[in-house]
Amino acid sequence: MRAAQDQRTIKRSDTGTIGTRGAGSFVRREPARLRRGGQGRPDVSGAGWHGARWTSVCVLASVLALAAAADAADQPQWGERYTRNMISAETGLPDSFDPATGKNIKWIAHLGGETHGTPVVAGGKVLVGTNNGDPRDGRHQGDRGVLMCFDEKDGKFLWQLVVPKIGGDPYLDWPSGGICSPPSVEGDRVYALSNRYEVMCLDLAGQANGNDGPYLDEGRHMAGRSGGAMAVTPIDADILWIFDLIKDAGIYPHDAAHASVLIDGPFLYVNTSNGVDNTHRKIRAPDAPALVVLEKATGRLVARDQEHLSPRTVHCTWSTPAMGEVNGRRLIFFGGPDGVVYAFEALKTMPPAGEVAKLNCVWRFDCDPEGVKENIHQYMGNRRQSASNIKGTPVFYKNRVYVAAGGDIWWGKELAWLKCIDASKTGDVTKTAEAWSYPVNLHCCATPSIAGGLVFITDLGRTIHCVDAETGKPCWTHKCRGEFWGSTLVADGKVYAGSRRGDFCILAADKEKKVLSSIDLDSPISSTPVAANGTIYISTQTRLYAVKKAAP
């Protein structure tokens, strides 16, 4: 089995050609279920603790200033640390590549049959969520959620987290959707969200250093409803703790779990994926939180929002939180499922055992104040009039928050905007904090990239937009073949983005549009490219590409 696994990595040879690709096949046809109008789902990117109080030796502003430099080599989470800006400090990145000839290809690894996860890179490993369409372990047959771990050097498969489906209603855990959430890595710990809505702490080494506790039931977890326990092997994940959002936070999930854990010292901030039921007209858990905070060491629930967002949830709670410091106060920025951006005061102290604190809301900004506010689910499927929601992540940059909001991709109006919000105000700032608003095409589930005074963002209108970060005035747009579910990456003076038609575009990150290259990849792209250690990583539906500029 190991030999077969190794053959699934396609390496660049000395002559620049591609060797055997082993099992599996390249897929060029976009599945009908995943075309626009179907029900496929997008990838919609600390200090020590002493006693009961986290003490910081410097203010968060200093940490944010140093974050890019400190994490420039690895890419251990969705976007830039804290701010979630979709940029990288990496240099020497390629402006073109060609899988057919091997040009600038470091390696290619096989994933499952459907991949919506964005890779993260940390500690010499690459992790990405996918499904079980191409099983690495013959014991696991059929639909599963999978988080795969590869060796950063050569793409060798190391270990995987395999999670059974919830079963029953497909709207709870969408068929073939796999694990969609990008994990977050700190040191030797991986914080991930499974397809069963479980926040997990994993050992980055997998089982290579033994099955660490306190959680020791990996075998039962893998077996799922089949009962009993499977043998834990060297290619299985090592789970340290689990927090079940359904059982322990009371959510009623919808479609697919999506969140990238925000790590802040001893705290983990996680959006909950609470949503509508299979009728798309009812919220089964109206009192469930939209945002929770867990204790990093144990997974204990320590805080939640108190904004009662769930009854106003248009579809589901998929936006990942960001963080920044404004006027000396650390704030958590959260894109609500009701189309409102919330700024919460970050926790300063750990609540006592058994206590669940309430997050303090500092300000709220309604991205669509003229949208439908009453009986919002009666407008499901209305492409002209509906409530708005937020699927991408708010980005904090120079005391401003940049975020995309608008009609739901599958059920809402065909209007969406990129908003720029002054983050320094308090209260309901809807009428006072908007710096500018820029309309995008159709719908948008992307997270912005902000660099060099410019903002770059994709949309479902097959367009990459470049606008002035200060004024919101358009600089240029670029049409690609497919709609975008993922976001742009800006790095080394270039803009990288891949579409649902499998075309991968590279442009200059400048006020004047310059197309550097367009590459035709094997299958649709739902994810966002990332950069780490001089390499670009791109996950398509079936492949993980490591793209690195060849030595002269």
Language-model features and meaning:
Residues 7, 17, 21-38, 42-43, ...:
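Intrinsic, low-complexity polybasic segments
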